From Swiss-Prot:
The keyword Cell membrane does not apply. This is Ribosome biogenesis protein RLP7. One of its GO terms (molecular function) is structural constituent of ribosome. Involved in the biogenesis of the 60S ribosomal subunit. May act as a specificity factor that binds precursor rRNAs and tethers the enzymes that carry out the early 5' to 3' exonucleolytic reactions that generate the mature rRNAs. GO terms for cellular component: cytosolic large ribosomal subunit; nucleolus. It is found in: Nucleus, Nucleolus. PROSITE patterns: RIBOSOMAL_L30 (PS00634). The lineage of its organism: Eukaryota, Fungi, Dikarya, Ascomycota, Saccharomycotina. The gene is RLP7.
Length: 212
């Protein structure tokens, strides 16, 4: 694990430098993405470097997802994780669906011995935890996330990773085609280093709509 903020920043910087040859794919404009953890290549051991980044992003469970702001620094991290994740740009409607229907947070109250996970359905809780940032309701969280506001990191780390309940290639009328596409991508991934494996992008709006 990366032990503190200084080490985290240094580690991300090193990964970004390693992936600098691919940065031309990044348009230069910060963009909202949802990144979802997938099983990865069958029988493959996750490299320690990849495991660290998965932990940094809190993607510790298969089919868990988090919002990220794609930047020049973050892009190489996504390249590194490409054999073990899929990504997509969520619409405002999808951000709203995820936050309103699937968001949970981990909180500690005065009488609790340990932190506990609760469903995010109380504006009072939002104001209690994020009021100092000017965020007082669930709709504020949706706005700050979708607009990549200055509080984006605070807001997205307040949310637990979303727990999704379907395999990302097993839904919708094009499921068979998507499975074939993923199988082809898997072949490329197995013969590629993590940093050069293709990033698999899906229709995240359709995926989330199928779940809710």
């Amino acid at each position: 694990l990366v032990s503190d903020a200084s080490n985290t920043k240094s580690y991300i910087s090193r990964v970004a430098q390693d992936g600098s040859k691919s940065k031309e794919i990044y348009s230069g404009k910060p963009t909202l993405y949802l990144i979802v953890r997938t099983p990865g290549p069958v029988g493959a051991k996750i490299p320690s470097k990849v495991q660290k980044v998965l932990q940094l992003l809190r993607l510790n469970k298969i089919n868990s997802g988090v919002f990220v702001k794609l930047t020049e620094t973050v892009y190489p991290l996504l390249k590194l994780l490409s054999p073990y994740t899929v990504i997509x740009q969520p619409s405002l409607q999808t951000v709203r669906q995820l936050v309103q229907k699937r968001a949970t947070v981990t909180v500690t109250h005065a009488n609790d011995e340990e932190p506990r996970q609760v469903k995010l359905n109380d504006n009072n809780l939002v104001e209690e935890k994020l009021g100092d940032e000017g965020i007082i309701c669930i709709e504020d969280i949706i706005h700050e996330t979708s607009h990549l506001a200055t509080t984006f990191k605070t807001v997205t780390h307040f949310l637990d990773p979303f727990e999704l309940n379907k395999d990302v290639v097993g839904y919708g009328p094009l499921a068979k085609l998507r499975k074939l596409e993923k199988q082809e991508a898997e072949k490329q991934r197995k013969t590629s280093n993590s940093g050069s494996a293709p990033i698999l992008e899906i229709d995240i709006d359709d995926f989330v709509a199928q779940q809710n």
